[in-house]
Amino acid sequence: MEKTMSLGLVGRKVGMTRIFTAEGDSIPVTVLDVSDNRVTQIKTVETDGYTAVQVAFGSRRASRVTKPLAGHLAKAGVEAGEILKEFRIEADKAAELSNGAVIGPDLFEVGQKVDVQGVSIGKGYAGTIKRYNFGSGRASHGNSRSHNVPGSIGMAQDPGRVFPGKRMTGHMGDETVTVQNLEIARIDADRKLLLVKGAVPGAKGGKVFVTPAVKTRAVKGAK
């Protein structure tokens, strides 16, 4: 399967709010700050074996930047950022960009479907009821100290092991999650904000990656 190559934006999750349509309908949206996405490197087939654009987002103190990275950023003429993200794109699109160029929210348009990737909120060590929606045991009537246990996790000597993938207690959350086909409800070009319909992974202040949707659904009845 060929990987879809498209340019995206790095952003910060500001939080959730709601907006109203002209008809008065309330739409829950997540506000994403995508300001100051700056190009730090253009990778080409001749120099790197593939075509991509490296983007920096956020800011970082000079004292917290390693010397190799400082030299890399100085070559591009950009300030250090919290994150360096690489987007694989077509060669003709890469030719339109240059080091130091700023990619703004006008990369997208209202109504466009996007995929948003982030790190989900960590929940710590959780049991199977919270982690996998297991049912609990009976509260009484013959049940003694087995109210929230997950049950059997395997068999006896044959096979003599717990099968991989068995749903058990463990660390919940703090995983990379991608939510697909979210619609851009509004774009605030002045403040460099994207308002995306629905929820996106992560806590307030978390970093997210916004890219054009790879599984856009065809309009029903369209030819």
From Swiss-Prot:
Signal peptide: none
GO molecular function annotations of the record: rRNA binding; structural constituent of ribosome
Keywords in alphabetical order: Methylation, Ribonucleoprotein, Ribosomal protein, RNA-binding, rRNA-binding
Cellular component GO terms, alphabetical: cytosolic large ribosomal subunit
Keyword RNA-binding carried by entry: yes
PTM (free text): Methylated by PrmB.
Example GO biological process: translation
Matching InterPro entries: Ribosomal_uL3, Ribosomal_uL3_bac/org-type, Ribosomal_uL3_CS, Transl_B-barrel_sf
Keyword Cytoplasm in record: no
Function: One of the primary rRNA binding proteins, it binds directly near the 3'-end of the 23S rRNA, where it nucleates assembly of the 50S subunit.
Protein name, as recorded: Large ribosomal subunit protein uL3
Gene of this entry: rplC
